[in-house]
Amino acid sequence: MSNAQLVEAAFRQRSAASAVVMDSAGDRGIALESFAKARTQFEPYARALDLVNKHITIRPEDIKDASAAYQELAEKLVEKLQWPSGAIRVFPQGSASTQTLIRSPDRTKFDIDAVCRVVIDAGYVSNPLTFFDDVGKGLEGLVVEAKNRCWKVNFPNRPYYIEFTPSVPLESVHIDKNGNDLRRLVAPGYIDTALAVVDRETKTWKTSNPEGLVKWVDEASKYKLVRVVMLKAALEHVMDSVRPVSEQEIAVDDTLRIAIRLFKRHRDMSVFHGHIDRQFQPISVILVTLLTQMYYGLAELGRTFENSVQLLVQLAELLPHMVPSYPTYGYFIGNPTVEGENFAERWNTDEGERAETFAKWCKLLRYDLETILSAADEKTIEEKARKVFGCTRDTGPSDGGGGGGGVSVSPTRRPPPPPRTQGLA
């Protein structure tokens, strides 16, 4: 099913709900009276979202320090395991690679996901656990914890930790123990970056493609769903004095990454205030995947929006309807670069807790975004945005442990909680 078809199905599923902000192609034809009017309409939302985005951005110096730290891990492996330096390549994955890494509202450390790609010798091909354990031996002397697919490396007195995933080029282990070619699982266009990682639970190699996922998000982010004429007019006025965007700072016109960041922040604030259970919160890769699918789908359907908050509301309205459930597989959120990988695998083993939490959070998210959208003036828009996303008057980038002036902890007034159900329909 294409992204457009997924979005159309989501529209149909929520058709009985309240009217959407921008739900007809005809809306695209409404003429704006002038650039001044366009700028006036867009500017307050652009300012408010830019303020929030800057507040949740992690300081560039902390990102630089973390990047140096994972390169040091690679050097440690070369030294301890006597692997050729040219055989190891380390690069970020997850939020750090998609530029959607954000600071935590509760002063906890931020995590950097890094992939350690190693060109292995033949002895490791049939012994993935030995490869994984040897990487662990190479990290001896550090504070490490073995997880299912990575080594968690903690750094005392630093605002981050690193989840270090050993991997190999898929080409080197592409035939599994049953004689199946793992390369057939890789989506067309992403084979060059495909990897195999160790799955300790099954004691096998599993296909992965973090760089492919980054490429997929990058391609989607090029679509502009907020009307171009408004965006250009507003940005010329709002962004004149903004300094060049660094690695983890994104401009307000990058509406896909802004959406991912803000939705992740809202999820974190919902956990922080106790509105949803941390154990069952939607994981970041699910939010990235669903939002990017919707973004592609809306672009393919020709949807455009008058301002960024309207786009966010539309995404929030569609979000709970983007997770299909099948009689055979249960809930399924597929990796767009690796066929068969289900990011929602744990949704099918928790008696509906994650699906139920997701549905509840989506309702809270939509309510809060509509609260911002309903504001009548710039001051109120900013105040509501600050409250929803837990921002203080300190709006600059900060460290992952909260930094700055902390966060607002007074909970936003909420609608009545949704009734308990068996999960998403």
Residue ranges and their predicted role:
Residues 83-87, 145-146, 278-280:
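Short helix-terminating capping/connector loops at secondary-structure junctions
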Residues 193-257, 262:
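Long, charge-rich alpha-helical interaction segments
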Residues 2-50, 313-425:
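Terminal (often C-terminal) interaction modules
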Residues 241-367, 371:
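Conserved nucleotidyltransferase catalytic core and NTase-mimicking acidic/glycine-rich helix/loop elements
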Residues 77, 81, 98, 129-208:
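Conserved catalytic core of two-metal-ion nucleotidyltransferases
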Residues 1-109, 120-130, 152, 405-407, ...:
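N-terminal regions immediately upstream of nucleotidyltransferase
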Residues 116-120, 295:
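Short beta-strand-to-loop capping motifs
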Residues 97-117, 154-165, 290:
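Histidine-centered divalent-metal-coordination microenvironment in nucleic-acid enzymes
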